[in-house]
Amino acid sequence: MPRPAYRSRSLRRVKVKTPGGRTVVHYEKRAKGVPKCAVTGQPLGGMNSKVYRFGISTRAPSRPYGGVVSHKVLARAIRYAVRR
């Protein structure tokens, strides 16, 4: 029986063959997905998904709602706000 911490599915299971010929299970963190727009769901440009040790302010573009919505949605929202 695995340790209680390993019973969760938050860690993915990888079967690894050892040099002795046994097959053992290694537990790894799951890969993170690409950042997506909150409105359209399309992948965000300018967001470095590989560098997760930095904070979001370092990774995200420095514009309003950078790292949350795509540039098209932001442009549409700004146009809507100006025309109102």
Swiss-Prot record:
Keywords: Ribonucleoprotein, Ribosomal protein. GO terms for molecular function: structural constituent of ribosome. The keyword Ribonucleoprotein applies. GO terms for biological process: translation. One of its GO terms (cellular component) is ribosome. It comes from the Archaea. This is Large ribosomal subunit protein eL34. Pfam families: Ribosomal_L34e (PF01199). Belongs to the eukaryotic ribosomal protein eL34 family. InterPro entries: Ribosomal_eL34 (IPR008195), Ribosomal_eL34_C_sf (IPR038562), Ribosomal_eL34_CS (IPR018065), Ribosomal_L34e_arc-type (IPR047868).
